[in-house]
């Protein structure tokens, strides 16, 4: 190990993004957390998600995952997009490669939040997937209306808040891979898909790192 690496380890000890434990080896997660990640058995969600043409989610938002996602979104750790995109490719890379997408589009973030956070985690994921899949990453989708923070709203409030809150450049029949970090009710993804199709997309399939556990047979929002 180089002197600089030793110095960095002393100043900034490596901690698991999930449990916070110190790690002796290089990496993002400790072996215990890495070995117990809540991967979904089926990555393709069976819920009715129109106007989405499909939704793929790699993991379930439970156990240790919420802490890792929180670190990624709110604690300035944009570099974790590399790690989470690798988890997505590990679980559903074959399906995404077979998708033959024309563009990869991230769920956009409103300007005030972007300025405060410094990055859009969905965009960071989309850029990493763009490299993996060799598909262009487009910024054609924009947030045009300010909305409340989603986790503060009920399912019905989320649907109402998202309505007409996005805009998109003119498209010409492209097949789109829509990317976000988490699917909760699906209202954001569905509104983005509606906007993309209204702009001319022929097909919109979404992919997220994780999805909140759903104990009902169909989504209510």
Predicted regions and their residues:
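Glycine-rich phosphate/pyrophosphate-handling loop used in enzymes and phosphotransfer proteins
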Residues: 1-180, 184-221
